[in-house]
Structure formats: C-alpha cells, structure tokens
Amino acid sequence: MGRSPCCDKLGLKKGPWTPEEDQKLLAYIEEHGHGSWRSLPEKAGLHRCGKSCRLRWTNYLRPDIKRGKFNLQEEQTIIQLHALLGNRWSAIATHLPKRTDNEIKNYWNTHLKKRLVKMGIDPVTHKPKNETPLSSLGLSKNAAILSHTAQWESARLEAEARLARESKLLHLQHYQTKTSSQPHHHHGFTHKSLLPNWTTKPHEDQQQLESPTSTVSFSEMKESIPAKIEFVGSSTGVTLMKEPEHDWINSTMHEFETTQMGEGIEEGFTGLLLGGDSIDRSFSGDKNETAGESSGGDCNYYEDNKNYLDSIFNFVDPSPSDSPMF
C-alpha cells in the first residue's frame, strides 16, 4: 500500500508536456522565480502537480542544461562510473557537467546498456557473459579492453580519494609540527668572546713581534689565539686556562726569549734534517756497520750524530721535574 501519485489524487493532467505548458512554466519562473513548487502550478495556470513542474524545470527547461547527443568521452565516462557506482545516477551526473541525472539514465537504458549486451558483456557486472562465447562473435578483445578500463577507472577513483585524505592528514600534521616547534638558541661561547677586547688599546695593536723562524706578526695572530693553552711538553698534561692580558704577554715574551736561546740548536737540527749528505752518510754508515764494511771515520760520525740527536730530544722532551711552568 504505497502512496498514490499526487496527480491521481487531485485529478491533474499527466503525460508529456506540451509546448504551451513549457512556455507558461518558463514565463512564470523568469518573472517570479519558482518559489514553492506546491503552489506554483495554480499561480502559473498549469493543471499539473508541483512535482511534475519541478522535474520538468530541472531536467529540461533550465537554461544551463546541455542538450544534444552524448559524445564518445561522455559515453566512456558513463560506462566506467556505472561499473563503479551502479545506478547512482545523481553521483554519475556530478562528473558530467551540464548533464542531468534523468538524461544520463535515459541514455544508459536506451543506448549504452543495449550496446554492452551486443558485445557480450553483462551490463550489471560489466563482465563477459559465460553463456555467450565471445570468440565466436569476434568481440573478446573489445570486451577485455572495456572490462580492464572499468576496473582501472574504479581503482583510479579509489586511489584519488585515498590520496586526497592522506594529503590532508599530512598537511595537518606538518602544520601542527611547525607550530609546536620552537627555535633552539645555543648559548655557547666562541673563542672570540673569551678573548680580551684588543680594540680598547690601539697603541698595542701597532706592536709587531717577529719570530726568528716565522714572518707572521703579532697583530695577525691575535684573531686566531685559542681560548686555552696546553703545554704538550709536560708529561703531566697540565692545561692552563687563558690568563689575563698582562700575564699572557709576559708568558709570550718569556717563550720568545726561550726561542732565541735555542736558536743555535734549532739551526743545527734544521741542518741535520735538510742536509742530504749528512743523512745519506748516517744511513750509509749504519748499513756498512751492519755488514761489517764500515770505516772508523764513518762510525765516529754516526756516533756523533746519535749523541747530537739524543741531546736534541732531551731538550725538546724534558722530564716533568725540568718542565718550565712559566
């Protein structure tokens, strides 16, 4: 026991619309708007129910409706979406601009459905029918392509929906991470922050201290002075933090005097390293002595060099008790 149509209940006209009725409906809506569809037929002078007027306007008389034959792209879209969505014509119509769901449904039932049946494809499942041998009809290739296209389109639509959701979630997570993160400030001090302010004493910047073995001036070295001084020569590994400016200059002058005192020893050691003949003679003397063919003069020369090297090593690497602590 369903509801009886409103046209039967009220005794209104049914069936196809005439051009005169279409003109009355268009004229009234253009002048007054449709308003309430229930009261529109009486105001427009039509012997139709409100539902019939609404469907006539929505599916046929709207000015933005695309009329005419469906093109090939629209037919493929309808078949692919029908394989995915079934008879949900309103959802299919959203993918076809300016086409109504009623028009799409009519075109499916009158053209596309019959075409699939002739190709041996079930219009409901979009799969080849088992009872009809497709090879005998010569349509197996087209059916396979159509089935594959429908499956691919279904997978594509599902993938697009999934990617849209994931992209929205990633964008939200990135925004939350960006807003929650705060910049980290490092409070470490560089060696320049520990050095004294040399610019406060301009008369000291003009003092040039030259080393007998280096051409670097003291003003060029002041930017690269480390924050602490470690005496490697001491076996105890004593590390002294940077002293004030006056104490540091005194220690530097003391080291400069020590360097001048050892100038003669450094010259001898440099001559030993750079003198190719002396090195060759020392090594040749070592080899000849091992082989039992060395002369007395070479042995004496080798012993002198050995004693000389021992004295240099003792000077460079003194014992902890003799290490100067400035």
Swiss-Prot record:
CDD domains in the cross-refs: SANT
GO annotation, cellular component aspect: nucleus
GO molecular function: DNA binding; DNA-binding transcription factor activity
Tissue expression notes: Expressed in trichomes, epidermis and mesophyll cells of young leaves, stems, petals, sepals, carpels and stamens.
Residue ranges of the annotated DNA-binding region, renumbered to this chain: 37-61, 89-112
Compartment list: Nucleus
Domain of life from the UniProt record: Eukaryota
Gene Ontology process terms (BP): cell morphogenesis; cuticle pattern formation; regulation of cutin biosynthetic process
UniProtKB keywords: Developmental protein, DNA-binding, Nucleus, Repeat, Transcription, Transcription regulation
Pfam families named in the record: Myb_DNA-binding
Regions of compositional bias (Polar residues) in chain numbering: 208-217
Listed Basic and acidic residues bias regions: 280-290
Record carries keyword Metal-binding: no
Domain annotation HTH myb-type: ranges: 9-61, 62-116
Region annotated Disordered, chain positions: 197-217, 280-299
PANTHER family per UniProt: MYB FAMILY TRANSCRIPTION FACTOR (PTHR10641), TRANSCRIPTION FACTOR MYB16 (PTHR10641:SF586)
Function: Involved in the control of epidermal cell morphogenesis in petals. Promotes unidirectional cell expansion once outgrowth has been initiated. Coordinately with WIN1/SHN1, participates in the regulation of cuticle biosynthesis and wax accumulation in reproductive organs and trichomes. Functions in cuticle nanoridge formation in petals and stamens, and in morphogenesis of petal conical cells and trichomes. Functions as a major regulator of cuticle formation in vegetative organs by regulating the cuticle biosynthesis genes CYP86A8/LCR and CER1.
Protein name: Transcription factor MYB16
